Amino acid sequence: MELISSSTIGNSALCLTLISILIFFFLTTTTIPTFPDHPLRSLLDDSQITTNSSSIVNPKSSCVSSRSHDNGGVINYFSLHYCIFNENLFFSIPILSLLILLHFYILIKTAQTHFSTVTTKLADRLNLSPSMAAVTLLALGNGAPDVFASVAALRGGQYRTGFGAILSAGTFVSAFVVGFVAIYAAPFPVDAASFVRDVLFYLIAALFLFYVYLSGEIFVWQAIGFVGFYIFFVGFVFWMDFGTNVEKGKSISEEEKDLLRLQDCEIAAGSLGSYKAEKEHQFSGIFRLYGTISRMWETPVSVLLNLTIPKPSPSEWSRFYRSANIVFCPFALLYTCNSFVQLNHPISFLFPNTHLPLWLVVLFMTSSLAFLHFTVEKQPPKTEQLPVIVVAFIMSVFWISTIAGELLNCLAALGTLLKLPPALLGLTVLAWGNSVGDLVADVAVAKAGRPAMAMAGCFAGPMFNMLVGLGSALVMQTANVYPDAYKLGFHVGIVIAFVFLLLSLMGSLLVITWSRFRVPRFWGICLVGLYVAFTFVSLIIASVST
């Protein structure tokens, strides 16, 4: 029992501290600009299609109105078309297409060279098993956009949108992302107890939510039960893994650690390029074109990411980049919390009667610290530092979430310019937007040699969104009407989403169990086909209802 003494308590305390920081990082804002608040992200609420589509994807065809059309992101893509290119589709379509490729490149680059690396290092430093890392690190990292979207939707009175967003994202991850991971990495084994536990807990949570939705009302104790159920799930995961660690005497074998270190080195050396080289013979034309384009922005993107995401490894340490991290990392976090604390918020600094904007004060303080670091620190640290790994993890999540939001806005603008139907946009572009980060991150983790962690994250992440994200939002709403119940309306689209979500979960449980807990590639193809069927059925329902 010595293993569950001081080291276990210390690691648990560090993990709880990290969770608290990330929850504050994601949930203290009400309108985070990097997570676009699109009511049609799931488009299971067809009433929103006709009433709100104009405010989302149909700005007036003028430069002035397009500038006033706030898409909640960094770049206003409609202004590019109406103001810069003077409504010339010959220029707008290629530029927006290139921007979409750029967004995908940054997503893949961030996930493979930073997120998967620091997640592996952080799990290793905290002695977390793949399951423990999945229910904490991957769930928090992948689920942040959907948690925010759910809270914002229900606080705005759009309960149907909140349910639809969670269910469509859950179906996307449990069907399409799991299928993609299976197609890429299969066949690979999964731990029988952990897999059955994760899927069963997710099934129970989905069935409980389905029951509550069909009842048409929810009480505050039921909403609290959602959040409490996930806390119980995390505790159960830790209890199971701690018991396994005591029996084995260690959480991760030395061989696995050596493999992870080797994979980290391979990723840092540029696994994205090697992956493209492996697949180039299959799709030579596409990859040759994409490779030519990506080489043009490889250096600028790498420099930008290195300026904002610290490198934990001493062998990759750079005095210039580490000093730049001290300046830019606080600014990125400050930008994320812009709605909570305005960048131009006046504060007294140095002199009582002098009011300076917050961003200027932060710039002065971080620049001073960066200059001090640059002049004092001459040698890299001898070992990897846990605070640096934590900051790198948070900044990787920041970039994945930010670029996923920009990709969503750019795709929505391109679809509007191509005059695609709003229902089709909602069921494809807007439904996939915030889940692109899940796809890229989980596939990157699988590519880093940990498909079991990626598989666990595919179930723990959506369950975190459902129980913590939607549960927290429902707690707020039910508390406002306590002791009465919060009323829920019926919509056939949400029932269809429940059905496909339950089909994907029960199918994975049966097929993988039948395959002796090895994930077969054919099941990945079936899951992708299941999601395609869900998209078509939902599109038909949305069109008929409209």
Swiss-Prot record:
Any GO CC annotation of this UniProt entry: nuclear periphery
GO biological process, one term: sodium ion transport
Subcellular location: Cell membrane
Membrane topology: Multi-pass membrane protein
Molecular function GO labels: antiporter activity; potassium ion transmembrane transporter activity; sodium ion transmembrane transporter activity
Chief location category: membrane
Keywords, in A-Z order: Antiport, Cell membrane, Ion transport, Membrane, Potassium, Potassium transport, Sodium, Sodium transport, Transmembrane, Transmembrane helix, Transport
Pfam families listed in its UniProt record: Na_Ca_ex
Transmembrane segments: 13-33, 88-108, 134-154, 163-183, 194-214, 218-238, 323-343, 356-376, 388-408, 423-445, 455-475, 492-512, 522-542
PANTHER family recorded: CATION_CALCIUM EXCHANGER 5 (PTHR12266:SF33), NA+/CA2+ K+ INDEPENDENT EXCHANGER (PTHR12266)
Stated role: Membrane-localized H(+)-dependent K(+) and Na(+) transporter.
Family affiliation: Belongs to the Ca(2+):cation antiporter (CaCA) (TC 2.A.19) family. Cation/calcium exchanger (CCX) subfamily.
Protein name, UniProt field: Cation/calcium exchanger 5
Taxon lineage: Eukaryota, Viridiplantae, Streptophyta, Embryophyta, Tracheophyta
